[in-house]
Amino acid sequence: MLRALNRLAARPETRPPTPLLLPVRGRKTRHDPPAKSKVGRVQTPPAVDPAEFFVLTERYRQYRETVRALRLEFTLEVRRKLHEARAGVLAERKAQQAITEHRELMAWNRDENRRMQELRIARLQLEAQAQEVQKAEAQAQRAQEEQAWVQLKEQEVLKLQEEAKNFITRENLEARIEEALDSPKSYNWAVTKEGQVVRN
């Protein structure tokens, strides 16, 4: 090891000077050979008192938990302060954005309500006009039906009046009998199944 250090220290003067490495006391590396006096030595760990070991282990555990809790508390406090510092500006910005978005949505809602109201009014007007037209058509059809019914009844009345002229009444009974007797027309005949007329 000293030879390697000496080789590192002995450099030509053309290069910049480097700090001189000196051997120091300390642990050997795993690649260094053991001393001659310690070849074959078996190291035995010192005896440990179980009660003392348990107490030390418990105290170290408590110490680690306490330090971990303090570290976590300090970390949370620092993060909370950073968050509050950032959230102050962000919260104000978000509030402003929310107000602006709310105003835009309210304006859009008013425009949409106005448009829907105009469409509703136009639809109601069209429906009212359609109902009026339908009502007028129904009245005209009803009037035509009534007029046709009146004409039919008038025709029936005229027909009955024409037929009533040939009715036999008490006043014209004798005259109709005389007329039938004086008529040369004979009703004494019949029709067979074959359609032939048989006269007597």
From Swiss-Prot:
Which cellular compartments is it found in?
Mitochondrion
Q: Which InterPro entries match?
A: Ribosomal_mS26
Superkingdom: Eukaryota
What GO CC terms are in its UniProt record?
Answer: mitochondrial inner membrane; mitochondrial small ribosomal subunit; mitochondrion; nucleoplasm
Give the sites modified to N6-acetyllysine: 159
Name one matching Pfam family: MRP-S26
Residue range of the transit peptide in the UniProt record, numbered on this chain = 1-27
Q: Where is this region: Disordered?
A: 1-44
Give the keywords, sorted.
Acetylation, Mitochondrion, Ribonucleoprotein, Ribosomal protein, Transit peptide
Give an example GO biological process.
mitochondrial translation
Belongs to which family? Belongs to the mitochondrion-specific ribosomal protein mS26 family.
Complex and partners: Component of the mitochondrial ribosome small subunit (28S) which comprises a 12S rRNA and about 30 distinct proteins.
Q: Would you tell me the protein name for this molecule? A: Small ribosomal subunit protein mS26
